[in-house]
Amino acid sequence: MTEIKDSSVKDENPGKQEESSIAVESREMSTATNNSKNIETTSSNGAEDIKIQRDVGDDKDLDDKEANDKSSKGLEEESDSKDRKTIETDQPSNNIGDIKSQKSEKSNGNARKETKQSERVNYKPGMRVLTKMSGFPWWPSMVVTESKMTSVARKSKPKRAGTFYPVIFFPNKEYLWTGSDSLTPLTSEAISQFLEKPKPKTASLIKAYKMAQSTPDLDSLSVPSSESEVSEEESDQEMSEPSPIEEDYNDTKARRITRKGTKKKTVTFDPSLESVPQKRLNASSNVSSNPAKKTRVSPRRSTAASKKKSPSSKRASSDEIEKDKEEEEGSVANEEDVAKRTFHSREQSLLFLRHKLQSSLLSPKQDLSQVDYKLVHNYLDKLANFQGIDVPLIQKTKIAVVVRKIFSLAGLPKENEDEVKSICGDILENRWKSLLQEISSQKQLSTDASQTQDASIANENETEIASLDEGSESKPTPSPPAEQLTDQKQNEDNEDKVKADSNGPTQNENETADASKDMISEEKSSKDADNSLEVAGKDFAEDGTEQTPNLAEPEDGVAAVDLSTGQK
């Protein structure tokens, strides 16, 4: 019996038999010792008692084995679970998606909790709350009724499904429709704690908290008056209606479209505008004379609007004039750019043809018998049929000079000479005849102009010279002043002294010698005069006594002078 039960147990747990074999053997040894003791004690009672005890012992052994197997199974399962837990804790989770999913589950759970909490709160009008907007911190505000809101704010209520609360912000009193997710209750304790904490805060946020503290309920809230609603409605109407500037701009735009012909648009004729030929320059008349367009303006603001129309219309007209000028300048600039580009492209193509013809026929080392005349014929045909050629292109590229040289070229093969020269002659005599005549006339005019200019310059020079000569003859030379004369004399004296030192006696010395000679001659003449007087006196004395003439005293106080001595 024991062997059968053991085999059944082994069949039930074949994988775990090896692990618990040591425990089973130890228990079998203990049971065997116990059985041997029982056999010894009961040997005296007889063989039957021994058999009974053995059977009982075998049954107990089987029960013990089953209990041990169960306990070993439980221990093994516990150890396996512990090993699994240690493996999971030791190995780090490399899957980032699992971590994100766990975090998202946590955040969703928190959000659900918050939404549940916010849904539980019943936000009533007059309740102070903190409202969250994107880009701003939680801002103090108050839940209000729709009657406290302006018409514009009431119209801005969201149409999607859900509950939305009208909120007014402190201190600017701006309205917003928001859901319960963006609201949290604001108590007076939270306000005082915020204001007492020394955290960095903005002035507007502090002002908002102070205003929320001073307005505990809806009755103490001062809502914007109805005038602001009227002004908002008027501003909406003004924004929806076109201004005079926009009307003028639309009119000018329609006129431009019809002028260009890109879009066909019917324009009604207004007979009242016949007296205004320049509508853009007088925008005020445009606004006043158009009865079809009526501006809806409140009576309070009609006077101000009428006063402000004239400067706005003037600005509009000036802006339109500037725009027209800019467009005209831009169109002119675009036309100039296009003309420059076309001229440049034509110039490059003519220079290419000139280079090909010159290199193939006019190069000094070129053998004319080995030239590919098919290419030459192709180049000449392109030149003959060239579109857009004019005088500036011919003058700048000098293509006509190359064609003339090819036309007068000698040494061309007889097979190709007639063909080449016929094309060149056709270009010079027929196709470019008028252009070449114009160039020659321009050259003649330039030469004539240069000659006339030279002649006029020569005549001007001659007239200037003649006028200078006449002026020198007619106008006397001015005499230099006295000071200048004295300076000149001193300079001359100094120069004479220098010459005397270097070259011997000068003219002054000669003059002094002449002066001394004159003095001597004068003395001689005076002596001769005295002798003649003495002789005359002697002659006068022959009438009476012989004596010298008696010179009486001079009349009228004239002193007598002794001629011999020269004294009085």
Swiss-Prot record:
Composition bias type Basic residues, residue spans: 255-266
Biased composition, class Polar residues, residue ranges: 29-46, 281-292
Listed Acidic residues bias regions: 229-249, 325-336
A GO cellular component annotation in the UniProt record: nucleus
Any GO MF annotation of the entry: methylated histone binding
GO biological process: chromatin remodeling
Domain PWWP: 125-189
Skewed-composition ranges (Low complexity): 214-228
Transmembrane segments: none
Name listed for the protein in its UniProt record: PWWP domain-containing protein2
Organism name: Schizosaccharomyces pombe (strain 972 / ATCC 24843) (Fission yeast)
Lineage per the UniProt record: Eukaryota, Fungi, Dikarya, Ascomycota, Taphrinomycotina
Gene from which this protein is expressed: pdp2
